[in-house]
Amino acid sequence: MKATIILLLLAQVSWAGPFQQRGLFDFMLEDEASGIGPEVPDDRDFEPSLGPVCPFRCQCHLRVVQCSDLGLDKVPKDLPPDTTLLDLQNNKITEIKDGDFKNLKNLHALILVNNKISKVSPGAFTPLVKLERLYLSKNQLKELPEKMPKTLQELRAHENEITKVRKVTFNGLNQMIVIELGTNPLKSSGIENGAFQGMKKLSYIRIADTNITSIPQGLPPSLTELHLDGNKISRVDAASLKGLNNLAKLGLSFNSISAVDNGSLANTPHLRELHLDNNKLTRVPGGLAEHKYIQVVYLHNNNISVVGSSDFCPPGHNTKKASYSGVSLFSNPVQYWEIQPSTFRCVYVRSAIQLGNYK
């Protein structure tokens, strides 16, 4: 049984929608394929000892300390110094204080999901010089913690009370790859321009189900996935996507978008998936026919009444354009018999096209 648990811990992560924490090792089953895998600790990092004492009521095994679901109101004392994963989720902790994690210089993952944390002392995470994953979701934070470890690769803080994202918060976090800030009362004015810009390895941002009305400015060119679903964005202009040359997936479903300005998609030359379903679009966004790599376009549940024969595919048979594997246009006013058959001439599998079912 123990061997099975450790194998789960060391499994490669995968992504499948918003992060849902349900147990100790579910933190490895993460959104949308970040590609981050936990490092196997090198036994040479630790000196032989008789073994530290496990905190009361917690479970300790192979440098994993599980103290979840115990009703704790503070971080346990005397945590084993060789701990690499500390699970404190589903407790009643209200504050993270300086010294709570002292001597945990080998900690790689810290799970604080579903507590009542409203305050984190500025130096609380300073001793964690090897921390790569920090999970703070489902708490009561109004701002992100200060002075997070420079080794951090993944930060998840959805379902808090965060209203501000400051640029200084991410200063020096050059190893960051994944940031999840969904389901917070964030407004566009609360995100400083260029707040994410300095993180040169950042590839995934999710700010879904908030109150932002525009795409954040100054996003890093390293981004490959941007998920802004369930917000109050009304328009996509060319400037908002400028410089996102590596973006492969853009999620803008369930907003109030009525227009995508001409030239916007040209700023994302490697885009493969575009999710614009459940918005207020009246026409197919311009630039799809010229886009070389795009393969999936979701436009269902909009107000599109006309689809032109050149909206999706270039003239003739342009072999340089990737074939679509998914185009959804159902639940729009346009009738399927009003669409010319040649409209989807660059779609080689007809089952990839979804039409009809408009009420």
UniProtKB/Swiss-Prot annotation:
Family note: Belongs to the small leucine-rich proteoglycan (SLRP) family. SLRP class I subfamily.
One BP annotation, GO: positive regulation of macroautophagy
Organism of derivation: Homo sapiens
Keyword Secreted: yes
Keywords: Corneal dystrophy, Disulfide bond, Extracellular matrix, Glycoprotein, Leucine-rich repeat, Proteoglycan, Repeat, Secreted, Signal
GO MF annotation, one: glycosaminoglycan binding
Repeat (LRR) residue spans along the chain: 73-93, 94-117, 118-141, 142-162, 163-186, 187-212, 213-233, 234-257, 258-281, 282-304, 305-334, 335-359
Propeptide segments, given as residue ranges: 17-30
Disease: Corneal dystrophy, congenital stromal: A corneal dystrophy characterized by congenital corneal opacification consisting of a large number of flakes and spots throughout all layers of the stroma. It results in progressive, painless visual loss. Corneal erosions and photophobia are absent.
Residues the record marks as carrying a glycan: 34, 211, 262, 303
Role according to the record: May affect the rate of fibrils formation.
Name of protein: Decorin
Signal peptide extent: 1-16
Disulfide bonds: 54-60, 58-67, 313-346
Domain of life: Eukaryota
One Gene Ontology cellular component: extracellular region
InterPro entries reported in the protein's UniProt record: Leu-rich_rpt (IPR001611), Leu-rich_rpt_typical-subtyp (IPR003591), LRR_dom_sf (IPR032675), LRRNT (IPR000372), SLRP (IPR050333), SLRP_I_decor/aspor/byglycan (IPR016352)
PANTHER family for the chain: AGAP008170-PA (PTHR45712), DECORIN (PTHR45712:SF14)
